[in-house]
């Protein structure tokens, strides 16, 4: 299946002109601002998850990871950036990549602080940033964050270890990571890939190690609320709890398959991350009728018929921060 996806991406990207990027930041741009509803004091900086990207393809023919979310924020007054990290690597390495781009945003905008938003494995990146540069962070929102790891990653790592297939898995997935880089108009070696490091970092066991060093916003109780404020930072989380949401969404099949494993061992989940694992700081809502990809409006915004629009939810969060002076 991964090979088919890789070949499809190769076919798509063969029509694009690959251009060198001097910055790995993608700033939200708009030709007109319709309101100041989402005009936060500090810029919003997004961190993608495992297998993530900024944009596959070009502006005119491509797909953003945060589909339609950043442009909407810009139209409503926000200064927002999407960062780029290695699709597959450890939480610490990705965290360093993220922090370097946060420093770039601070330099570009002259802002004193930043509002961070991380999805999936990106939750580790934003939490890493709170640990290494807390005075520069105003708020954190984790979205479907693997804050306690995922049983899916744990089981994949156990399978790799027991069958001795770890190196083969690493080679195949790293090759797919290179395809993702190419699809963004980048050299495949622009960011280092280490699928086994990524698997360990997102496993329950690996995340427990990470949490010993970066425990801000986490609860001592299973599935509990963390501190809402810590060191002057406002801490929030949201997540979905429905693996399959729309028959027209081709990703739902994968979410349903993964749910069979996650639900058996971890209960309610979004197809990859359990509701309990997604807990961080103040839970805004943990029952959005979304799956793991709906949370970022991926697959061109296809979602459940009556599900809230993720674009609106991110805009509302920006307004929440604005009202707090953040």
Which residue stretches match the model-derived regions?
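Sec-dependent signal peptide recognition
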Residues: 2-8
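N-terminal signal peptide c-region/cleavage motif recognized by signal peptidases
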Residues: 13-17
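N-terminal low-complexity, Pro/Thr/Ser-rich intrinsically disordered segments
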Residues: 23-42
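Serine-dependent carboxylesterase/thioesterase catalytic core
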Residues: 48, 96-206, 270
């Amino acid at each position: 299946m991964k090979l088919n996806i890789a070949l499809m991406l190769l076919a798509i990207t063969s029509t694009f002109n690959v251009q060198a990027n001097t910055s790995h930041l993608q700033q939200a741009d708009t030709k007109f601002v319709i309101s100041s509803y989402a005009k936060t004091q500090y810029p919003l900086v997004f961190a993608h998850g495992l297998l993530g990207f900024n944009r596959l393809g070009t502006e005119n023919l491509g797909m953003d990871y945060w589909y339609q979310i950043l442009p909407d924020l810009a139209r409503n007054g926000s200064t927002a950036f999407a960062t780029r990290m290695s699709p597959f690597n450890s939480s610490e390495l990705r965290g360093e990549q993220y922090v370097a781009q946060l420093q770039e945003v601070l330099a570009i905008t002259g802002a004193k602080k930043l509002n961070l938003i991380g999805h999936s494995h990106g939750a580790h990146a934003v939490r890493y940033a709170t640990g290494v540069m807390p005075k520069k962070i105003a708020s954190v929102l984790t979205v479907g964050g693997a804050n306690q790891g995922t049983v899916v990653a744990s089981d994949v790592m156990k399978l790799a270890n027991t069958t001795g297939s770890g190196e083969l898995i690493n080679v195949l997935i790293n090759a797919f990571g290179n395809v993702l880089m190419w699809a963004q108009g980048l050299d495949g070696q622009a960011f280092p890939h280490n699928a086994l490091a990524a698997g360990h970092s997102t496993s329950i066991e690996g995340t427990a190690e990470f949490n010993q060093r970066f425990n801000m916003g986490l609860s001592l109780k299973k599935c509990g609320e963390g501190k809402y404020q810590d060191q002057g930072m406002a801490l929030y989380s949201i997540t979905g709890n429905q693996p399959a949401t729309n028959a027209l969404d081709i990703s739902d099949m994968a979410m349903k398959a993964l749910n069979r494993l996650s639900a058996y061992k971890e209960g309610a989940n979004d197809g990859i991350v359990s509701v309990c694992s997604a807990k961080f700081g103040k839970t805004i809502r943990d029952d959005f009728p979304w799956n793991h990809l709906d949370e970022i409006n991926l697959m061109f915004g296809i979602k459940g018929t009556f599900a809230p629009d993720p674009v609106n939810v991110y805009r509302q969060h920006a307004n929440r921060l604005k009202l707090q002076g953040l």
